[in-house]
Amino acid sequence: MEGKWLLCLLLVLGTAAIQAHDGHDDDMIDIEDDLDDVIEEVEDSKSKSDTSTPPSPKVTYKAPVPTGEVYFADSFDRGSLSGWILSKAKKDDTDDEIAKYDGKWEVDEMKETKLPGDKGLVLMSRAKHHAISAKLNKPFLFDTKPLIVQYEVNFQNGIECGGAYVKLLSKTSELNLDQFHDKTPYTIMFGPDKCGEDYKLHFIFRHKNPKTGVYEEKHAKRPDADLKTYFTDKKTHLYTLILNPDNSFEILVDQSVVNSGNLLNDMTPPVNPSREIEDPEDRKPEDWDERPKIADPDAVKPDDWDEDAPSKIPDEEATKPEGWLDDEPEYIPDPDAEKPEDWDEDMDGEWEAPQIANPKCESAPGCGVWQRPMIDNPNYKGKWKPPMIDNPNYQGIWKPRKIPNPDFFEDLEPFRMTPFSAIGLELWSMTSDIFFDNFIISGDRRVVDDWANDGWGLKKAADGAAEPGVVGQMLEAAEERPWLWVVYILTVALPVFLVILFCCSGKKQSNAMEYKKTDAPQPDVKDEEGKEEEKNKGDEEEEEEKLEEKQKSDAEEDGGTGSQDEEDSKPKAEEDEILNRSPRNRKPRRE
């Protein structure tokens, strides 16, 4: 009960606040102005206090250095594009206006860097083709060492449609980096790519058919992990590809595995073709019967089957309702309508008033010619069809026969791919300021991990040092998603309200405790409490009258000792009265 009163009180206070707001708009404006002044003062004092407060410890940047043998490594901290070659090629089958690879590249720090001095390769322009590449220290040969490719990407402005993948360019005599374009042969393509709501993390390798010498792209299965955050959180992420001589592979993001598999089993299309194929010359015989069911040829239509019977018939038991207005139309011309002044009968034809519902039909069951309602025809059977039976001549679904695949081959070591001698980025992007950093290619996992700790690890530590607290993160999230304010308010206000409700609502004493304290009469049955009270009241009055008469007679007999007896009789009378009220001494109910 007290909880209900508290809820009512809150509703009343809320209503009063709304009414006060409606009646004192001018006062609220003044209050808002005062609050603005206070906020400005707080911000000024905060800025002053910030200047006096010592800054939080910062992570000092130091360029990573390879700790072992690498085929390629670049942290861009020298501040230039030296070692990288911009493409001068044009794309085939593309308009001249966009065929050129004229997208801009620069070496610069991130726009909101937490590590001063840390620079990277930045794709600067949007809606342009970009191509840049660099030679390896020496070509990578797929022999007994694993291949590990790793680099960092930060979508500083998010990403609408575009990629941030790398290509490992195949070692060929025709390789010319200043003519690097989309058709330049590559061995592996690896990295993130996104367009619309399709988030990808590519791993593609080009496999050479040992029989024909033709290369075919093999795509790894899609990762099971949700990749969206890596494209939208505007943080630097570390992408790693590991290929092992046993044909296994792993794809990691921020040093956590998001995809893994085997080159023989988890690529599409498969590396090795099937041993048998369907004979392209085989043809289905003309008498081949693929029908599992056929109409029973021995079935006969029953004599009483009427195919012409309609599905609906008029209800012969229906009668026209009383008051039906047969002579009144359901719609009539609007008597209040007037022909527009600009109506030209030569151009617009003869003017007719718009139709409105007949007002006479509103009080009647209906207007116009009455027709019997339609009901389902109990004799309707429809078109007769013979029942279906199993086809005794069913031969199954025809398939062409299998023959040995003339193009079959079996490559059990797809890891031994075409050697590559350069790394390149050939990208189209609708978003600018894509930041690349800390490329490394090696055959030693330890060297790559050390490089990651000295490069990406510092970025992660710097981001953690500058990361706002839990409250700050909640406020930032609410700024991006305003509906979170409702969640925060409910999360905070509801527990507070429950605590107040618990503290303010005292434990109510039970009725049994109350009766025990006062020795008041307690009804045996609550539903008959009213009747019992009326009956007990009459019995009490009768007992009191008898008690008074007895006291008077005792007083007359005792004379001088009457006063003392009266004093003794008072507590006794009160005790008798209490006993009479007790449910144990209550008289039986009168029927």
Curated annotation (Swiss-Prot):
Modification Phosphothreonine, positions: 561
GO BP terms: clathrin-dependent endocytosis; ERAD pathway; protein folding; synaptic vesicle endocytosis
Phosphoserine modification, residue list: 553, 563, 582
One GO cellular component term: dendrite cytoplasm
Xref: SUPFAM superfamilies: Concanavalin A-like lectins/glucanases, P-domain of calnexin/calreticulin
GO function terms (MF aspect): apolipoprotein binding; calcium ion binding; carbohydrate binding; ionotropic glutamate receptor binding; unfolded protein binding
Membrane topology label: Single-pass type I membrane protein
InterPro entries, per the entry: Calret/calnex, Calret/calnex_CS, Calreticulin/calnexin_P_dom_sf, ConA-like_dom_sf
Chain segments carrying region 4 X approximate repeats: 279-346, 349-406
Quaternary structure and interacting proteins, as annotated: Interacts with MAPK3/ERK1. Interacts with KCNH2. Associates with ribosomes. Interacts with SGIP1; involved in negative regulation of endocytosis. The palmitoylated form interacts with the ribosome-translocon complex component SSR1, promoting efficient folding of glycoproteins. Interacts with SERPINA2P/SERPINA2 and with the S and Z variants of SERPINA1. Interacts with PPIB. Interacts with ZNRF4. Interacts with SMIM22. Interacts with TMX2. Interacts with TMEM35A/NACHO and CHRNA7. Interacts with reticulophagy regulators RETREG2 and RETREG3.
Protein name: Calnexin
Organism of derivation: Rattus norvegicus
